[in-house]
């Protein structure tokens, strides 16, 4: 399923699956399916601070990104998925990016991601997806720790 998650799945499971799908559609460079995971009034905040509002504009924005850039692929670790209300959930994760033609993450691209999902008409959609650079200013040990955790996750994914 590429357009959200059904009400049948437990909420936290459905939200984790929605997050998995957003990364998968990015990794496949599929702007259409990426945008369809958002609510019609959903918002995207990119790693560079760009803000895009609305499902159609998100799709158009990513079409341009994918046409003009060789985007790296994601590896991630979910740190939290919890309900904020009956039909609203929050997911937080750490993410690394593996540049094209490389087999290791680029630590300069590590990010903390936040996703707010809403259930509408029985389907989970993304209301907000935000990427924040994991700079950890003046705390290089945290940056190094995150990089090692993401590398371990990448190695695990490569094996399995």
What are these regions (language model features)?
Residues 97-101, 117:
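Beta-strand elements of well-folded, non-transmembrane domains
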């Amino acid at each position: 399923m590429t357009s959200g998650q059904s009400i049948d799945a437990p909420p936290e499971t459905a939200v984790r699956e929605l997050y998995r799908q957003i990364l998968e559609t990015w990794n496949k460079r599929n702007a259409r399916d990426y945008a369809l995971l958002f609510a019609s009034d959903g918002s995207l905040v990119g790693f560079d601070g760009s803000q895009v509002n609305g499902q159609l504009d998100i799709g158009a924005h990513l079409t341009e990104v994918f046409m003009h850039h060789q985007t790296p692929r994601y590896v991630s670790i979910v740190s939290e998925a919890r309900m904020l209300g009956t039909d609203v959930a929050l997911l937080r994760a750490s993410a690394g990016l593996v540049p094209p033609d490389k087999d290791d993450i680029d630590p300069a691209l590590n990010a903390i991601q936040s996703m707010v999902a809403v259930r509408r008409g029985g389907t989970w959609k993304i209301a907000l997806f935000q990427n924040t650079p994991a700079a950890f200013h003046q705390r290089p040990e945290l940056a190094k720790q995150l990089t090692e955790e993401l590398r371990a996750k990448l190695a695990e994914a490569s094996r399995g």
